[in-house]
Amino acid sequence: MKKYKAGIINVTGYAGLELARILASHPSVELCSVTGRSLAGKKLSDAFPYLHSLDLPITESLEGEVDIAFMALPHKEGASLVPDLLSKGMRVIDISADFRLKDPPLYQAWYGFEHPCPELLAEAVYGLPELKRKDIASARLVANPGCYPTSAILGLAPAFKMDLIEPNAIVDAKSGLSGSGRTPTAKNIFCEASEDVCAYSIGTHRHQPEIVQELSLVGGGVIPRVTFCPHLVPMSRGILSSAYARLKQPVTDEEVKEIYRRFYKDEPFVKITAEPPHTRYTRGTNMCFIYPVVDALNERLIVISCIDNLVKGAAGQAVQNMNIMLGLSEDTGLKAIAALP
């Protein structure tokens, strides 16, 4: 069986490391090159002993033949590299936000930079397989969704698609600390984060336009108003989103659950649960657990969704996209089940 060759640009962040962990046991793909300027010259297995089977040198740029390149650089640092990678025949999956938004001015407004290659924004495919599978299959460039948007969009997409709710939603989301990256800050160091929960970027979080953009496409072009309020909670990984929207007409709890079951019936990584899910159900897996429920008294739909922010919210979804692009079974290398306790 042919093995495709993959490379990771910036393996040293949490998303890059999670990619390496997943690809280490992928039966159809060989991780052949990894970069990371801060650790260039070291072996990956020496710098991160838990990746003991990956005896690869960390280099400053990708080396050798690479079929598919994963970009795991911080926002705005990698966009200018993509045209060169594409010109060399590589297919690219970018885990940053650099190609998620379609409107170039939004990058200046929300990310503070002018996009260096806006001509690629129209070509880039938003990599949420449950909604864009056919486009992903033929894409040269896939924009891997953000962690919060993955949870929020999967939770609300059936309701918008089936016109169950008014185009006005609230998404209240809680994330583990790994979502803020490996670089220590006052928000994520132990003494500040332990035994503490805080909201941040209320109404100004840069994932908000991404959520709105994709839900508007699901809803037939109607641009929804989404109030997004993220929180940091003292756990290492996981996202739990609670979404609220007013129902357009009366509907029973079981009718809503059946709509969600039908919408996701063929999806390997989405499960509609009978009870509100826990983030620990998703730990280390590519699963998204969703619990829709009707608040009949207030005529609202409430949807609870949870994912592992580093897997379905980043590296696992990137590998899922890669599998689709390479014509592999979608769940290849992604069949892990969460470990409890």
UniProtKB/Swiss-Prot annotation:
The listed locations are: Cytoplasm
In its keyword annotation, does this UniProt entry include Acetylation?
no
Gene Ontology CC terms? cytoplasm
Question: GO MF terms on file?
Answer: N-acetyl-gamma-glutamyl-phosphate reductase activity; NAD binding; NADP+ binding
Enzyme Commission identifier(s): 1.2.1.38
- Biological role stated in the UniProt entry: Catalyzes the NADPH-dependent reduction of N-acetyl-5-glutamyl phosphate to yield N-acetyl-L-glutamate 5-semialdehyde.
Q: What is this protein called?
A: N-acetyl-gamma-glutamyl-phosphate reductase
Gene field: argC
